Amino acid sequence: MPLFLEAGATVITRKGCVQSPLLWGLALCADLVLANTVVEARAVRALSGARVPVLWWLHDAFAGYPHIAHQIPRELGENIRLYSVGSHAANAMHSVRPEFNIRPLIYGLPDYAAEKFSHYDLSYAGGRPLFATVGSFENRKGQDIFCKAIRLLPPETMKKASFLFVGKAAEAEMMDAVRSLTADCPDNVFYVKRLTRDEIKSLMAQCTCLVCASRDDPMPTFVTEGLIFGKPAIVSEHTGTAGLITEGVDGFVYEDDDPEKLAERLAWAIEHPEKLAAMRPACRELYESHYSKQAFFRQFTTGRKGAYRRISSPFFITLPKLRTKKFGGCSTNTPPDCDILS
């Protein structure tokens, strides 16, 4: 949303917009409706064939589709365009609607490396190369795979590195795997429940490599944040990032959710920290070419035709005082609790 605001758009947000006829009126008067994630399937179905262009932006993992597939329309009007944050999110939709045409539109992140932020003290890592993972502890995120891979490392190799798990425990099984590992390896395996935004940025600036062992992850944000600081990542093939990595140039991909294959990549990285450091320019280039705000703008505008190139006020809808404002030539009463950002 900040990118739309910076471009001079008027943005309306509303949590329950599909339940209000007045808010539907706002949508039909907009220059663009952005339906964010597959959860908006019912709204997309209702707007299919309307005169307003709709950008349906998919960020979703495979895990959610069995619960919502019945709501996804089987055909889309010409006003509906599908985009996804990467090949993984597109493949998830194709698992239930293989005929849909889905274009790439990867989110853009600010250049955190150019910002000032407070320093996060990582002295507990002992000055060793630090391999970190960030995310809620759940089966889909695969912390247990990372734990098994660490245990598979040769003892002498493992002692040369430190490992950090950051995240809240959503599933006990994942948390148990991490707690067991930190108990067995207290000198170089660490767990932190939560870090502030500044602490995350500082972690990305200081760590050696990120590890994403997810079983199902459309586009892990912490991996992208690492790229901003020129840090490579070892990622599962079941992530959106895997489709953009050039093996050994700006990251590494392992297959089959296999801890042994992850351990192989980890062992090489631990033994060759200087080669990881040499990957920094390529990692930064990957961020600039695919994940920067400028890259998002290029993707958003390239190839758009007609109304997609004339967007002036995309709308999201939220709900406070009744007021009147003109939208795209329509004079509309703004419903209670509706936030207008411009």
Language-model features: locations:
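Conserved donor-binding/catalytic core segment of Leloir-type glycosyltransferases
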Residues: Y83, S123-K141, C147-I150, L164
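Aromatic "clamp/platform" in nucleotide-sugar-dependent glycosyltransferases that forms part
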Residues: R215
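Short alpha-helical donor nucleotide-sugar binding micro-motif in glycosyltransferases
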Residues: L26-A27, R194-L195, S202-C207
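Short, structured helix-loop element that forms part of the nucleotide-activated donor/catalytic region
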Residues: P2-L5, S162-D187, E199
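A short, active-site helix/loop in glycosyltransferases that binds the activated sugar's phosphate group
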Residues: A43, P66, E78-I102, L109
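Short hydrophobic beta-strand element within catalytic cores of glycosyltransferases
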Residues: P232-V235
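A short, well-ordered alpha-helix in the C-terminal region of glycosyltransferases
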Residues: K261, W268, K275-H290
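Conserved acidic donor-binding segment of nucleotide-sugar-dependent glycosyltransferases
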Residues: E247-G248, F252-D258, W268-P273
